[in-house]
């Protein structure tokens, strides 16, 4: 399982990006959230298999009015919590 934090730039606000990405992610069994930012970008955090996340990103970029020009991605493969001594 992988968690990705992604910032999308381009024509990503006012074109149904959040709705379409939510629908696609849900259909692939992914979890997470997506929101518009004040600077015109969209921020997303998504969790699931690497293959499903890749499929979601491919499908988002195929949507009619969405034009992603840049994606900044941070991947998390596991989280380590500190233990009490």
Protein language model annotation of sequence segments:
Residues 21, 56-62:
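Short amphipathic alpha-helices in soluble, non-transmembrane regions
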Residues 2-10:
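Short glycine-/aliphatic-rich beta-strand segments at the starts of folded cytosolic domains
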Residues 11-26:
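Short amphipathic alpha-helix segments
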Residues 31-47:
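Amphipathic, hydrophobic secondary-structure cores in small proteins
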